[in-house]
Amino acid sequence: MTHVNVGTVDVYLIAPDPAGWEVLTLQRALSTRCPTAWETVHGRIEPGEAPEQAAVREVREETGLEVLRLYNVIVQPFYLHTLATVELAVVFAAFVDGAAPIALGEEHMLYEWLPPDAALERFVWPRERQALRDVLQLLGTGDAGAVEDVLRVF
């Protein structure tokens, strides 16, 4: 029997700059699943943890960065055939200080800040590219405009 699980967060890190935004891309380490694939911050929601708490924790664990502003953006499904589970990923956008030092966790070996168009090309998974497009559409002016009160977590 196939199950549905809300168990994953994806977080797109944005370094705002008047000259143009940059998006953090992370390359997976050789010892992990999908070695050398480029992705966004991605991780599991721990038992008893809200998705937004998981997002902040995963950003800290995978990059060492502190989230300055957090927005919920979309929910995306994907299928884990080995677990017979439709996994729902809660997608967030996090504004961070792009000048702050990055401390990569064990899952990643490289990082690169890229303009949004280049990040769209870098991400391996089509769902990540679509989510980044949604982030850019909703937050492209620097905030969520008329829906700020609904999307902004803090």
Residue ranges and their predicted role:
Residues 6, 76-101, 112:
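Active-site-adjacent beta-strand/loop module that shapes the phosphate/pyrophosphate-binding cleft
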Residues 14-16, 29, 95:
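A generic structural motif
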Residues 20-61:
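Conserved Nudix-box catalytic region and its N-terminal flanking loop in Nudix hydrolases
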Residues 91, 102-135:
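NUDIX/MutT-family hydrolases
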Residues 65-75:
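A short coil-to-beta-strand element that immediately follows conserved catalytic motifs
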Residues 127-154:
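Charged phosphate-binding loop/patch that engages nucleotide di/tri-phosphates or the phosphate backbone
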Residues 4-6, 18, 33, 84-87, ...:
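A generic fold-level signal
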Residues 1-24:
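Conserved N-terminal beta-strand and adjoining loop/helix that marks the start
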